């Protein structure tokens, strides 16, 4: 197998670029397939066939902490807990990680962002996901790999995310921009299939994560992504941009897309809409303006 590049992949990797590294001991491939409302779907899909040597990460068990009365649906894991999970997976500081999901990179981007948060920069997302892998005619496997335990110490970066109080203070300021990754109909409050309250945070602008992707699930060219984000940001700097969604998952797709377009410094509202509405006194807005 080819040795890892001296310049680790940090955003996106294609199926063709990943294929030569399958089975390399210093590469970790993580299947993140998941479906909200059907939490066993991804694990069943993994059992039916996955990229060879990939392990499985469950959104609820591995990429989130238990829900609390004040949290959103997918709280950030405790750094020490997440580091223990990564150690069990075989991660070391020199490991190149590649995350993938079915095709839209939302769940894979959650792992990508969590790894960056705890200090592991050598992580990329498979562009187009498992769909792109199989479309390329590349092999799959049903074997669950056994990996030696690694060693990883979390170094969480508090600058990468904001809590609800911090978002409330910034959301309507002219020098900050809050982008909501949910679908337009959810943002407008016309429908709400998941959370008990519909609408959005006052001051937020809608930037649906699906607009970052083509029909094949691959990300749009970097120049196109940059133009779309700059339109949504409307003159606000990257490091004064906050992204959110329903629970801090699909918003990570926005962060990945921004970085793939050369735009670094945006922050995640980790609790997102499902945490915002925990307190009935917090304002909500409906409509698109």
Where are the regions that the model predicts?
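Cytosolic catalytic domains that perform sulfur/thiol-centered chemistry
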Residues: 1-289
